[in-house]
């Protein structure tokens, strides 16, 4: 006889193992109480048996834990993890800096990407490495990454290395300084014995003594000191940044018998800050000009400097903003989501002789105003829409452009000069812009209020192309069953950076009733219907918009109309996982659809069919034909707590 087949040999080995295991792990007993605590008792009509549970070995009356970690092949821990035996089982433990992932073993933890795992300094950059992370101080700073501070001279233009808490950081001294409110620093104050030995760092002078260091030699025995200190040089303009100057002390007939190095910076708003050092001797103190009492230049804008004229300080336009040619007049254009704003600088207008400014758009009812947010500019605003203020809309395949003309005059009547500036804002076509620039888009709207966050408006619209830039327009949509439906949902208003729009259930019905029992699900429980290969979900739960497409269809039976419905949810990206994870065959969960969060669109008519839709059916979906963009649903409010 030849050798037995390999299959038979394996069957014999396996059977022997089972027989041995059964014989070893099971014993008969009189009562279940005789079984070990880690055994299972089985009672039938005649026999009571004790069997050791999985992970234990013995006869059932006595069961001992199996050490799976010591038996080759008894555990499935990966090579880069450690097996730890536990009673009846085992666990796989990853080294520090790694995390156990199903099917992948130990994977590196990105401490830089997960909040609370890295402990770098606030200014440092976290760099992930395998099993750990590094903290790197920014350029110009020194430290180990857990602690960073700047070094003198390492900061950028207009900044200095200043103390903040226990560290040194780069900061603008116009914001990072201390104040000196001491009336006796005025050059009009008499003698005294003040000495500025404790002054080190950035200071701003305020109060009745004056707001600026004196720029001329101060007589001795003034400013409550013996040898007054004054600034040997002029104050800088705001565009010069931080400049170095010398402060001189007057004594014994010498206006600069002693000196100290100081730094000065002009700040927006007409005040100065000084990086002062202690004087070389006592009694020496810094003196201020009484004609510069705070308030004389508080109205200076960023285009102006505070200048002294015959001992008095006032605002003057910077030299850079003085122009004589109208062609050099600059305008600032801001293209916002809902409006356009064009502004002209007051200093340039003043240098051109415009003591009074009359500015208006193509529709003269839209006129200029002094910009509250920035006193340097005079502005005019128009909505980014076709029509208001004479704004004209032009559109191509990729952009929508709104254009208008700004007119400028220096008198109510015009004879010699008629200045006009053409301006335009172009917006790339996306779902929102394309809806905004269409006359009658097929769109549905729903208002949702999220507690403590604000009012959100969610819209759903039907588009003609896969780029979602050409919405269907008019009072109805007729398509063949070969055509594709491109459906877009979008979120407006509120804090869009925090919330993602999630389509939880999107389905079709043959009637306008969203609760119709006959439903065809396109998206169900957040995921696409896997048995319909024409369904493509482009975006869901990732941003403030959602998109999907499906080939047009008809319901079996005597149905020629299709209505679309989408249940939407505002997902908090800070506290929830918003992007769905969809794989394999999915089954209906049976969850109830919240009709207060459902958007409705329709009807969509199959091409070649003359649809008859009652007035009530249109009304139930809010289908109103108006001159403004068409809205296809009533506005509802839902509060999330």
UniProtKB/Swiss-Prot annotation:
One of its GO terms (cellular component) is cilium. Glycans are attached at residues 25, 76, 232, 275, 322, 447. Residues 598-606 are annotated as: External hydrophobic patch (EHP). One of its GO terms (biological process) is defense response to Gram-negative bacterium. The keyword Calcium applies. Residues 334-429 are annotated as: ZP-N. It is a lipid-anchor; GPI-anchor. Keywords: Calcium, Cell membrane, Cell projection, Disulfide bond, EGF-like domain, Glycoprotein, GPI-anchor, Immunity, Innate immunity, Lipoprotein, Membrane, Repeat, Secreted, Signal. The keyword Chaperone does not apply. The record marks 587-588 as: Cleavage. SUPFAM superfamilies: Growth factor receptor domain. Residues 615-641 form a propeptide. N-glycosylated. Proteolytically cleaved at a conserved C-terminal proteolytic cleavage site to generate the secreted form found in urine. This cleavage is catalyzed by HPN. Its main location: membrane. Residues 172-291 are annotated as: D10C. Residues 28-64, 65-107, 108-149, 292-323 form the EGF-like domain. InterPro entries: EGF-like_Ca-bd_dom, EGF-like_dom, EGF-type_Asp/Asn_hydroxyl_site, EGF_Ca-bd_CS, EGF_dom, Growth_fac_rcpt_cys_sf, NOTCH1_EGF-like, ZP-C. A lipid is attached at residue 614 (GPI-anchor amidated serine). Disulfide bonds join 32-41, 35-50, 52-63, 69-83, 77-92, 94-106, 112-126, 120-135, 137-148, 150-161, 155-170, 174-267, 195-282, 217-255, 223-287, 248-256, 297-306, 300-315, 317-347, 335-425, 366-389, 506-566, 527-582, 571-578. This is Uromodulin. The gene is UMOD.
């Amino acid at each position: 006889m030849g050798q037995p087949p390999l299959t038979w040999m394996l069957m014999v080995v396996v059977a022997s193992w089972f027989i041995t295991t059964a014989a070893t792990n099971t014993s008969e007993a009189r009562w279940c109480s005789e079984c070990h605590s880690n055994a299972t008792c089985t009672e039938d009509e005649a026999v009571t048996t004790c069997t050791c549970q999985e992970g234990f070995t013995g006869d059932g009356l006595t069961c001992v834990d199996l050490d799976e970690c010591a038996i080759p092949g008894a555990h499935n821990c990966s090579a880069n993890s450690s097996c730890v035996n536990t009673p009846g089982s085992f666990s796989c433990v990853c080294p520090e800096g790694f995390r156990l992932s199903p099917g992948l073993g130990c994977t590196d933890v990105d401490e830089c990407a997960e909040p609370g795992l890295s402990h770098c300094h606030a200014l440092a950059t976290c760099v992930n490495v395998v099993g750990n992370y590094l903290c790197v101080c920014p350029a110009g700073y020194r430290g180990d990454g857990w602690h960073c501070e700047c070094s003198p001279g390492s900061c950028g233009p207009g900044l200095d290395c200043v103390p903040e808490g226990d560290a040194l950081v780069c900061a603008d001294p116009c914001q990072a300084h201390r104040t000196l409110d001491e009336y006796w620093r005025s050059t009009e104050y008499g003698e005294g014995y003040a000495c500025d030995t404790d002054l080190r760092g950035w200071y701003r002078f305020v109060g009745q003594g004056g707001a600026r260091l004196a720029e001329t030699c101060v007589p001795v025995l003034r400013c409550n000191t013996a040898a007054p200190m004054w600034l040997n040089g002029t104050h800088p303009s705001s565009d010069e940044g931080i400049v170095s100057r010398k402060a001189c002390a007057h004594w014994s007939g010498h206006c600069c018998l002693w000196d100290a190095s100081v730094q000065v910076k002009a700040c927006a708003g007409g005040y100065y800050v000084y990086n002062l050092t202690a004087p070389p001797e006592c009694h020496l103190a810094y003196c201020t000009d009484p004609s510069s009492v705070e308030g004389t230049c508080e109205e200076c804008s960023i285009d102006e400097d505070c200048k002294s004229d015959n001992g008095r300080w006032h605002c003057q336009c910077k030299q850079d903003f003085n122009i004589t040619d109208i062609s050099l007049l600059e305008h600032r254009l801001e293209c916002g989501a809902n409006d356009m704003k064009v502004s002209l600088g007051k200093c340039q207008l003043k240098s051109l002789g415009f003591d009074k400014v009359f500015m208006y758009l193509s529709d003269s009812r839209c006129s200029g105003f002094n910009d509250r947010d920035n006193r340097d500019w005079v502005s005019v605003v128009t909505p980014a829409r076709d029509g208001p203020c004479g704004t004209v809309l032009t559109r191509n395949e990729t952009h929508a452009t709104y254009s208008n003309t700004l007119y400028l005059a220096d008198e109510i009547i015009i004879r010699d000069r008629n200045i006009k500036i053409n301006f335009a804002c172009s917006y790339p076509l996306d779902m929102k812009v394309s809806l905004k620039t269409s006359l009658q888009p097929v769109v549905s709207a729903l208002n949702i209020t999220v507690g403590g966050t604000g009012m959100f408006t969610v819209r759903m619209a039907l588009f003609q192309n896969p780029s979602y830039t050409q919405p269907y327009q008019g009072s109805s949509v007729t398509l063949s069953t070969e055509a594709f439906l491109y459906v877009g949902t979008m979120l407006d208003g509120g804090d869009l950076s925090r919330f993602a729009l999630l389509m939880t259930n999107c389905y079709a019905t043959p009637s306008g009733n969203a609760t119709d029992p006959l439903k065809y699900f396109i998206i169900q429980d957040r995921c696409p219907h896997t048995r319909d290969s024409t369904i493509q979900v482009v975006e869901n739960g990732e941003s403030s918009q959602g998109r999907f497409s499906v080939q047009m269809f008809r319901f079996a039976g005597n149905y020629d109309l299709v209505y679309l419905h989408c249940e939407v949810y505002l997902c908090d990206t800070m506290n929830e996982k918003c992007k769905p994870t969809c794989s394999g065959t999915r089954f209906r969960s049976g969850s109830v659809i919240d009709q207060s969060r459902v958007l409705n669109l329709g009807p969509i008519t199959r091409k070649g069919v003359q649809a008859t839709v009652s007035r009530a059916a249109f009304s139930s979906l809010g289908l109103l034909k108006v001159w403004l963009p068409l809205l296809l649903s009533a506005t509802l409010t839902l509060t999330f707590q």
